[in-house]
A protein has these predicted regions:
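Glycine-centric low-complexity/flexibility signal
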Residues: 25-26, 86-90, 131, 146-148, ...
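Bacterial Sec-dependent N-terminal signal peptides
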Residues: 1-22
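Extended Gly/Ser/Thr-rich low-complexity repeat segments
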Residues: 62-80, 128-148, 181
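Autoprocessing Asn-cyclization modules and mimics
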Residues: 21-106, 115-123, 151-165
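Short solvent-exposed strand/turn elements
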Residues: 115-136, 170-173
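Short coil-to-beta-strand transition motifs
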Residues: 99-108, 140-146
Length: 335
């Protein structure tokens, strides 16, 4: 019910360290679809200034010819863990971000040593705090001397599975030539699942009953199971932080997820209004006419039984029939 949030990092930078082994993985040519990163998770909180982290698997040798070793490069990023306002399921403020709780913190780190299967020692201290329950991903980054993506080649990532994936990160010290594609489309946060059980008249912004609306999209708060367990809000149109809301009512589509933007410019998850429909917007929300809002695009309307004119008949007008073409599509995610 929402567009995926994708994190892409294609990196060209210099690390100053006696252990630096820039270009150690040599010249890379991509001729087919290929994943070049390896992933694991943080299993204990890590604090600013620390030079050691505890992980699920320190070998990080998937897609590499050897296990993680001194001089290798990793990325550390906290993907989730934000808290939201879930006080009132009947208002659109449900889902507004209260605290990021380290979500979004990330940095690039060089390995000093790997003393055991669950520990990575770093040659420089951490710049940020990280909360393990917020799904902190550790990404091993290849260190190429040059990179060529041939025509037909696709550099990509593993899909986000709720713990790892969804991130493509590389380091190139020399020339990068891309004649193919670097593509991680639809590999990030997962959208809500299609649900055909909702009924007429749903007005809530959060609920655990699928009869009230469709499933929300995943985002920086957590996944759908987290919504149902801790927020009583797996379904319906409210946007949980940057995740798009599910539609309320038959045919009311889900919304898009948000990327970066100004949170103050988010207006009820409407997204960017198309000027072609300014007349229609004026019938519905006059304040949105000509305004570009931050965040994901809003979903559609509930079904109508007549073919009316949206430029003259406002949503909810009795002449629409059916479920009155109500404005109950999912709210676009917050930036």
């Amino acid at each position: 019910m929402r567009k995926s949030l994708i994190i892409i990092n294609v990196l060209l930078f210099i690390v100053n360290s006696s252990f630096a082994q820039r270009g150690k993985d040599g010249a890379k040519t991509v001729t087919a679809t290929e994943v070049v990163n390896s992933y694991t998770t943080l299993t204990a909180n890590a604090t600013l200034g620390s030079t050691s982290i505890t992980v699920a698997n320190s070998s990080l040798n998937n897609n590499f010819s050897s296990v993680l070793a001194p001089g290798d490069l990793i990325m550390m990023i906290q993907v989730q863990g934000a808290t939201i306002n879930n006080a009132n399921q009947f208002v659109s403020t449900w889902g507004e971000i209260l605290n990021y709780n380290n979500c979004g913190n990330y940095e690039f780190l060089q390995v000093e040593s790997v003393p055991n299967p669950t520990t990575i020692n770093l040659d420089c201290p951490l710049n940020f705090d990280y909360t393990a329950l917020g799904n902190v991903v550790i990404v091993r980054i290849p260190r190429y001397s040059s990179l060529t993506v041939n025509a037909g080649g696709i550099l990509t990532a593993d899909a986000w599975n709720g713990l790892t994936g969804g991130i493509l990160a590389i380091e190139v010290t020399g020339t990068t030539t891309v004649n193919g594609n670097i593509d991680v489309s639809n590999l990030g946060f997962r959208g809500g699942q299609i649900d055909a059980s909702s009924t007429f008249g749903g007005t809530r912004y959060a609920d655990n009953d699928p009869l009230e609306g469709a499933e929300k999209g995943e985002g920086i708060v957590g996944n759908q199971l987290f919504y149902s367990t801790f927020l009583a809000g797996r379904y319906t149109r409210g946007a949980a932080a940057n995740g798009g809301g599910g539609g309320n009512g038959h045919n009311a589509g889900g919304a898009g997820g948000a990327n970066a933007g100004n949170p103050l410019n988010w207006t009820d998850g409407a997204g960017v209004s198309d000027p072609i429909y300014n007349v229609s917007w004026a019938l519905e929300i006059p304040s949105l006419v000509g305004v570009s809002n931050s965040g994901g695009g809003r979903g559609g309307y509930s079904h109508a039984s007549t073919n009316g004119n949206e430029l003259t008949q406002a949503p909810g007008y009795a002449a629409w029939g059916g479920d009155l073409r109500r404005q109950v599509g999912g709210l676009g995610g917050r930036p």
